[in-house]
C-alpha cells in the first residue's frame, strides 16, 4: 500500500481523554449522519449511557447502499476488463474503508485512491486495506483536495474512472466520544475531523460574537431558536468558558422551550450539527469538491454521492443540475453542436434506501444518493 507524503508522518492518533456519561438524555441520533434514527426525545430523567457503551461500538459498521454503489459505478470500472484492470476509483470519503474494500475485492485489478482528512480513519482503513498492497494509495486531505490527490497519484493526464462520496460524520467518529461529535456522553468540545486543524467547537462557542453564533446555528443547524441559544451562550461564557459537550447540552435544555424539546428528536442535535459543519468547513469544502471531482473524471466516468442531510444534498443537487444542463445559450430553438450537457443523470432525483436495507442497516434511513456519468468526448 502506498501513502502520500501527507500521510506517512501521522501519529497513531490522540490518546483518549476522560469521558463521563451525561445526566441528560443519551441519544446518538443526528439527522445527517450514519447512525440509527429515532423519533423519540428522551426525558431529562432518562438513564444515562454508560461510558463503555458510548465509547465502544461492537456492531459492525455496515456501508450504506453498498450494492447500489457498486451497481452504479461498475460499468465505468469495467470498460476495459471485468476485473477492473486499468481502472481507478477515488473514494473521496474513505472512513473505515468499507465501501473501498468491497470494490477492491469485487474488481481484483482495480486501483484505489482513498482520501480522508481524519488521520485515525486513514490508520484504520490502512490496516483494513493492507492486503490489497500497492493497488491502494491513501492521501490525507479534505475532499476538495481531490484534484491535487489525483495529480499526486499520477492520474491527472488520463483522469479517473469513478468517484464515490459518502458525506457526513461517520459512525466511527461518533463512537469515539473523546472527539466531541456526540452529545450522549460528556467529552471535550472538539469536533475536528482533522486533529491537526486549529478551530475547535469550544473556540467557536467561546470566541464568536452573538450575531456570528446565531448565524452558524441558524444556517448550518436550521435551528429556529438560534438567537435565543446564541444569547445564552454569550451570557454563560462571560463567567465560565465552555469546555465540554455536557456543558453545552445543559445550556441547550435551558434555552430551548420545553414544548420544542418534546418533538423532533434530541434538542442538541441541530446545534451539534451546526458546530461540526462550522469547525470543519464542510459545506464550503463540498461546494469546491463536487466541481473538482467532475473535472477529474474521464469520459464515461461515473460519480456517486450519498448525502445525509438537506444542506449537503442541496449542494449536490445544484451542482449535478448544472452539470446535466445544456450549454447552448438560452433562447435558441435548437441545441448547438458541442454544447450539449457534459453529464447525464444515472438516478431519477435522489434514491433512498429501501425498507429491507433500513431494517438491516438503520444508518441508511436518511441517505440520499445521486449519480452521474460523464458524456463521451467531454
UniProtKB/Swiss-Prot annotation:
Its main location: cytoplasm. GO terms for molecular function: rRNA (cytosine-N4-)-methyltransferase activity. One of its GO terms (cellular component) is cytoplasm. Keywords: Cytoplasm, Methyltransferase, rRNA processing, S-adenosyl-L-methionine, Transferase. Its EC number is 2.1.1.199. It catalyses: cytidine(1402) in 16S rRNA + S-adenosyl-L-methionine = N(4)-methylcytidine(1402) in 16S rRNA + S-adenosyl-L-homocysteine + H(+). S-adenosyl-L-methionine binds at residues 97-99, 116, 143, 166, 173. It is found in: Cytoplasm. Residues 29-56 are annotated as: Disordered. Residues 43-54 have a biased composition (Low complexity). GO terms for biological process: rRNA base methylation. Belongs to the methyltransferase superfamily. RsmH family. Specifically methylates the N4 position of cytidine in position 1402 (C1402) of 16S rRNA. This is Ribosomal RNA small subunit methyltransferase H. It comes from Mycolicibacterium vanbaalenii (strain DSM 7251 / JCM 13017 / BCRC 16820 / KCTC 9966 / NRRL B-24157 / PYR-1) (Mycobacterium vanbaalenii).
Amino acid at each position: 500500500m502506498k501513502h502520500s507524503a501527507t500521510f506517512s508522518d501521522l501519529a497513531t492518533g490522540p490518546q483518549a481523554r476522560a469521558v463521563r456519561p451525561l445526566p441528560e438524555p443519551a441519544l446518538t441520533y443526528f439527522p445527517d449522519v450514519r447512525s440509527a434514527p429515532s423519533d423519540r426525545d428522551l426525558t431529562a430523567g432518562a438513564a444515562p449511557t454508560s461510558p463503555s457503551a458510548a465509547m465502544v461500538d461492537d456492531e459492525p459498521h455496515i456501508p450504506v447502499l453498498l450494492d447500489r454503489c457498486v451497481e452504479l459505478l461498475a460499468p465505468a470500472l469495467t470498460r476495459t476488463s471485468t476485473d477492473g484492470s486499468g481502472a481507478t476509483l477515488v473514494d473521496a470519503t474513505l472512513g473505515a474503508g468499507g465501501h473501498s474494500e468491497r470494490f477492491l475485492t469485487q474488481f481484483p485489478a482495480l486501483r484505489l485512491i482513498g482520501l480522508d482528512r481524519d488521520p485515525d480513519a486513514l490508520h484504520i482503513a490502512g490496516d483494513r486495506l493492507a492486503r490489497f498492497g500497492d493497488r491502494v494509495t491513501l492521501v490525507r486531505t479534505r475532499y476538495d483536495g481531490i484534484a491535487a490527490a489525483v495529480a499526486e497519484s499520477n492520474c491527472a493526464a488520463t483522469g479517473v474512472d469513478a468517484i464515490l462520496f459518502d458525506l457526513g460524520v461517520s459512525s466511527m467518529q461518533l463512537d469515539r466520544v473523546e472527539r466531541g461529535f456526540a452529545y450522549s456522553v460528556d467529552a471535550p468540545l472538539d469536533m475536528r475531523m482533522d486533529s491537526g486543524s486549529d478551530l475547535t467547537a469550544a473556540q467557536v462557542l467561546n470566541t464568536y460574537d452573538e450575531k456570528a453564533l446565531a448565524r452558524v446555528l441558524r444556517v448550518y443547524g436550521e435551528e429556529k431558536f438560534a438567537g435565543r441559544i446564541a444569547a445564552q451562550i454569550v451570557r454563560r461564557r462571560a463567567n465560565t468558558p465552555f469546555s465540554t459537550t455536557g456543558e453545552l447540552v445543559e445550556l441547550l435544555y435551558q434555552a430551548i422551550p420545553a414544548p420544542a424539546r418534546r418533538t423532533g428528536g434530541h434538542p442538541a442535535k441541530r446545534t451539534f450539527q451546526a458546530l461540526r459543519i462550522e469547525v470543519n468547513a464542510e459545506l464550503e469544502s463540498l461546494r469546491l469538491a463536487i466541481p473538482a471531482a467532475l473535472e477529474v473524471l474521464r469520459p464515461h466516468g461515473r460519480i456517486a454521492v450519498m448525502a445525509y442531510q438537506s444542506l449537503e444534498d442541496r449542494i449536490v443537487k445544484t451542482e449535478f443540475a448544472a452539470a446535466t444542463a445544456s450549454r447552448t445559450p438560452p433562447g435558441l430553438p435548437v441545441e448547438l453542436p458541442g454544447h450539449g450537457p457534459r453529464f447525464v443523470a444515472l438516478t431519477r432525483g435522489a434514491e433512498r434506501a429501501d425498507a429491507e436495507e433500513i431494517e438491516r442497516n438503520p444508518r441508511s434511513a436518511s441517505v440520499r444518493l445521486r449519480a452521474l456519468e460523464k458524456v463521451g468526448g467531454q
